[in-house]
């Protein structure tokens, strides 16, 4: 079964397109966590609190790139899989072929075993081929990102009155030979989200609806292809318990935040 088939089943089963971003910023982890691997301990409780509402988990590799962090990430992915939830590794990789092949081993069962990965298309198709060729795995390619500086390059007009991100979208559609390609298109610029949807029928990963304040209605209206796609919130969910009196109250708030986002998005499905 392909990644997007697995994701479609999960979306139907949970009636949710919520992607929960697992970005355990060490500076924001609650003080009550007392464990050898605090990021793993935190993620475990987040998964326990949110898995009923999650279509997918999206750990960002930057929060795990040290020895203890990598162990925490391995445990996190295995635990999410144990709950029946697919995992999208947000790594934004992009490098020449030999290096890209090594990055792609993160998808192997004897690597991290992630179900999908994010990738950067700036260096061209050959840098993406190790992901594109994996029919059983998914790759979400950066297209129009949600950060404020995304327009610096992505919105440049590069020919035929098309912007760079529009060319990226069209090319990714051409590369979707194994039906395993999605696009990262942020919710902070809904008119651009719509313009990409007008060009392609790929599933989107739509970040920016949580702490970044993106447009939830546009994220659902334009982010799904045949009902398949993901709308991500990281900080808005996993740190929803900040200020709680105790551990149980903290993670009840986390679970409630995931449920609220699911309900908010489902109003537009």
Curated annotation (Swiss-Prot):
Entry keyword Amino-acid biosynthesis: no
What's the family? Belongs to the OMP decarboxylase family. Type 2 subfamily.
- HAMAP family assigned: OMPdecase_type2
The reply on keyword Lyase is yes
Q: In which pathway does it act?
A: Pyrimidine metabolism; UMP biosynthesis via de novo pathway; UMP from orotate: step 2/2
Q: What is the lineage of its organism?
A: Archaea, Methanobacteriati, Methanobacteriota, Stenosarchaea group, Halobacteria
Q: Which Pfam families match?
A: OMPdecase
Q: Which UniProt keywords apply?
A: Decarboxylase, Lyase, Pyrimidine biosynthesis
InterPro entries named among the record's database cross-references? Aldolase_TIM, OMPdecase_AS, OMPdecase_type-2, OMPdeCOase_dom, RibuloseP-bd_barrel
Q: Which domain of life is it from?
A: Archaea
Where do the catalytic residues lie? 92
> EC?
4.1.1.23
Reaction(s) this enzyme catalyzes, per UniProt:
orotidine 5'-phosphate + H(+) = UMP + CO2
What GO MF annotations does this protein's record show?
orotidine-5'-phosphate decarboxylase activity
Q: What SUPFAM superfamilies has UniProt attached to this entry? A: Ribulose-phoshate binding barrel
Supply one GO BP term.
Answer: 'de novo' pyrimidine nucleobase biosynthetic process
Q: What is this protein called?
A: Orotidine 5'-phosphate decarboxylase
């Amino acid at each position: 079964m392909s990644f997007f088939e697995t994701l479609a089943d999960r979306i139907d089963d949970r009636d949710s397109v919520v992607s929960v971003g697992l970005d355990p910023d060490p500076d924001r982890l609650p003080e009550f966590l007392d464990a050898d691997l605090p990021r793993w301990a935190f993620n475990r409780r987040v998964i326990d609190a949110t898995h009923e509402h999650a279509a997918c988990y999206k750990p960002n590799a930057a929060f795990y790139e040290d020895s203890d962090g990598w162990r925490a990430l391995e445990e996190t992915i295995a635990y999410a899989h144990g709950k029946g939830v697919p995992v999208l590794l947000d790594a934004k990789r992009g490098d020449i072929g030999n290096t890209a092949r090594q990055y792609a081993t993160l998808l192997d069962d004897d690597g991290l075993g992630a179900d999908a990965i994010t990738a950067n298309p700036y260096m061209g198709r050959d840098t993406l081929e190790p992901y594109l060729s994996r029919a059983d795995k998914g790759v979400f390619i950066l297209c129009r990102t949600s950060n404020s500086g995304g327009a610096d390059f992505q919105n440049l007009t590069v020919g035929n009155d098309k912007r760079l991100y529009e060319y990226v979208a069209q090319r990714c559609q051409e590369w979707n030979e194994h039906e395993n390609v999605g696009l990262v298109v942020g919710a902070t610029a809904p008119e651009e989200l719509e313009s990409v949807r007008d060009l392609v029928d790929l599933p989107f990963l739509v970040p920016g609806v949580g702490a970044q304040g993106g447009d939830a209605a546009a994220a659902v209206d334009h982010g799904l292809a045949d009902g398949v796609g993901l709308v991500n919130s990281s900080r808005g969910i996993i740190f929803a318990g900040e200020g709680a009196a105790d551990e149980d109250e903290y993670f009840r708030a986390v679970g409630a935040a995931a449920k609220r986002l699911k309900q908010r998005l489902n109003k537009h499905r």
